[in-house]
Amino acid sequence: MKVSQIMVEPISIDKDQRLSHALDILDKKRVDRLVVTQDGNLVGIITYADITDRLGVSKVVAVSIGRLHVSSAMTDTVITVKPDDEITDVAQLMVDRGMSGCPVVDDDENIVGVITKREISELVQKFDQVMVKDLMTTEELLVVNPVERLVKARMEMLTAGFSGMPVVDSGRVLGLLTEKMVAEAMARFSVEVPDKYRANQIRQIRVVDAMLTQPPLAYPDESIADGAKKMLDALLNTLPVVAEKNRLVGIISATDFTRFVANKFKVPEPEAQD
């Protein structure tokens, strides 16, 4: 299968547009990245993670999002793929490079599409014999308590390279926090709180102020087809995997599904024990 078969139309924004405008487009178009252009040429990409990263920088906190430009937050080192590249190869590239998506360009470097882990995740919806427990991540889980400061949760998420993490209390799932939720909460704060108070008050925002309560949940013994559908229908990239009484036992994410596709739609072999 080729990239051209599942890529989606690129949504672009000029690098000199306001960062607040980028956030509006991301929300209205229900996507998690925009292609950044200058005079019609590709110069970068901007994602919720980029916006979250920029808005949390200490010297930027006191600046309203309406005064920031896309160029100040975008990623300007962009890896592109071709329409005729194999999906399994692109999935492996994303896993190896820790990328969540990339622009698709033709031989003349014209932008013709975008492919992300979400498009790749859609491919697993026909695999009803593979269970969530076969692919889910169970080790080194990143979780957060609802009363933790949002700025701390933001830093943990960015450092780990996760797009979302379960919100738990005493091992039970209470919600989900994603890059999008953090970016939107920080943008609201930037607009609603006067400049002179932001540096102090930003530390008062808690995870509970931004998180999604009662998120969709996945279960170890349900198929990845069902798990992927829940995730995609909710426009999420991560789902908590729970056992009885909503006890967290893992996460299943677009990264796990992409790894499955990169492995040519095979369940990875268990690692040998020393």
Predicted segments, located by residue:
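Tandem CBS (Bateman) regulatory domains
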Residues: 1-9, 47-78, 91, 111-143, ...
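A glycine-centered beta-loop-beta connector
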Residues: 26, 34-49, 94, 102-118, ...
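The conserved cystathionine-beta-synthase
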Residues: 12-30, 37, 80-98, 105-106, ...
